[in-house]
């Protein structure tokens, strides 16, 4: 039954993504070419970079893949399926801007291992020292379970809250760091295990490549990005197995 469910899910995703990709293609000639599409207030920032996973014990293994992320000002552009700016401020006990780093859904499919809410003080503009708190939303693969927790952006230690891999147990802590996003973007999580030590690290390293308010440009920039992330994760599961 599980195999049939998986096949049905894959077939549905393939059909939906194909149809929505065709619709996106039809929209391209009619995309607005205005100043608003290039940036301005509330523009979504676009980042390109790489995610790297490195496992040192019990057996060494490493892989990396290219990724694209969006940084969204939630006060100006609320997103369905995510915390509102007001909810994020309440959770983080902050009073300023809230910006969400995430891989947006593409052509009907969502695969987003990590989203980060950057919560600033009220006086914050773009200065690193005013980033007060972060909220992480982690989704495991293949189960699709989610967990959310706050952490200090410079560096923080949290008890491991979620089973994220069939090759890791639930022991230990996560050491997590998130620099304030600017022209460069960096997020890292290291696993501190009571017997294996610091045996696993995952890091996102990216650069700002543009910004836009145009929905078609956003859709084309992130076209099939969640699918590529999922393919990379499942391929590595096969290799490790």
Regions found by a protein language model. Give the residues of each.
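Mature, function-bearing regions of proteins
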Residues: 1-241
């Amino acid at each position: 039954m599980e195999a049939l469910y998986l096949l049905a899910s894959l077939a549905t995703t393939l059909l939906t993504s194909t149809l929505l990709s065709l619709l996106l293609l039809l929209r391209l000639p009619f995309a607005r070419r205005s100043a608003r599409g290039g940036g301005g207030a509330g523009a979504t920032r676009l980042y390109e970079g790489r995610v790297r996973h490195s496992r040192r014990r019990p057996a060494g293994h490493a892989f990396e893949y290219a990724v694209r992320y969006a940084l969204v000002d939630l006060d100006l552009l609320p997103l369905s399926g995510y915390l509102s700016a007001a909810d994020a401020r309440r959770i983080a006990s902050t009073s300023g801007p809230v910006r969400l780093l995430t891989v947006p859904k593409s052509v009907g499919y969502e695969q987003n291992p990590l989203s980060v809410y950057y919560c600033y003080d009220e006086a914050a503009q773009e200065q690193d020292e005013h980033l007060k708190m972060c909220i992480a939303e982690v989704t495991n693969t293949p189960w699709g379970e989610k967990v959310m927790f706050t952490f200090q952006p410079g560096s923080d230690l949290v008890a491991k809250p979620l089973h994220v891999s069939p090759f890791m147990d639930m022991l230990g802590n996560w050491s997590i760091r998130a620099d304030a996003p600017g022209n460069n973007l960096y997020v890292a999580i290291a696993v501190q295990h009571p017997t294996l030590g610091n045996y696993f690290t995952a890091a996102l390293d990216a650069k700002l490549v543009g910004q836009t308010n145009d929905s078609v440009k956003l859709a084309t920039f992130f076209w099939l990005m969640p699918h590529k992330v999922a393919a990379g994760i499942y391929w590595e599961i096969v290799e490790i197995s």
